[in-house]
């Protein structure tokens, strides 16, 4: 640590999961009130059983340990570590769509019942979604068995899925649910 004090332990509680703080589009932080100081990012976040559940990453606050801390979940870190060991780089899945939120008004017009999923604003030509038959205006409701409640969930789930995997997308089109199979590409 920057102060030369080794073996320091702090305590706190997990106050939220699945936090996005605007650092990148692939965020899924654990929020904690444990004291995280300048320079100690990368330290482990433990649960009460002594298991590592995250890697301390960021703090929101003006000065040192005063604020809210964020940690990358250990399962997300493990995926990156495994890819770095195997390939020397990370490989993220890619659908090739630009998406936006499904508003209450859009849900009503589309007879969706409630606002959920990710509205496809555009499909990149030649992308996996283009090849798989996804169209502008489709609403992606489910990705490979995982329900998409809010638009921002989709990019993270896609990025964490293996490149080349064939996934099933449940899509709302013309006021009915259809299923499409897509072979994920690689995000460059």
Roles of regions detected by a PLM:
Residues 1-116, 121-126, 132, 151-166, ...:
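Serine-dependent protease modules
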Residues 137:
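Conserved catalytic motifs of ABC-family nucleotide-binding domains
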């Amino acid at each position: 640590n920057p102060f030369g004090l080794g073996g320091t332990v702090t305590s706190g509680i997990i106050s939220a999961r699945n936090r996005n703080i605007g650092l990148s589009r692939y965020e899924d932080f654990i929020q904690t009130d444990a004291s995280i100081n300048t320079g100690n990012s990368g330290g482990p976040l433990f649960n009460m059983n002594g298991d590592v559940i995250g890697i301390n990453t960021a703090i929101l606050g003006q000065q040192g340990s005063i604020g809210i801390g964020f940690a990358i979940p250990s399962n997300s870190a493990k995926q990156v570590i495994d890819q770095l060991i195997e390939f020397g780089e990370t490989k993220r899945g890619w659908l090739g769509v630009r998406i936006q939120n499904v508003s209450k008004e859009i849900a009503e017009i589309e007879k969706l019942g409630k606002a959920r999923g990710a509205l496809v604003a555009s499909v990149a030509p030649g992308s996996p979604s283009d090849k798989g038959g996804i169209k502008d205006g489709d609403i992606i409701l489910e990705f490979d068995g995982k329900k998409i409640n809010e638009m921002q969930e989709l990019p993270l789930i896609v990025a964490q899925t293996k490149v080349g995997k064939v996934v099933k997308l449940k899509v709302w089109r013309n006021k009915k649910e259809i299923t499409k199979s897509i072979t994920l590409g690689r995000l460059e």
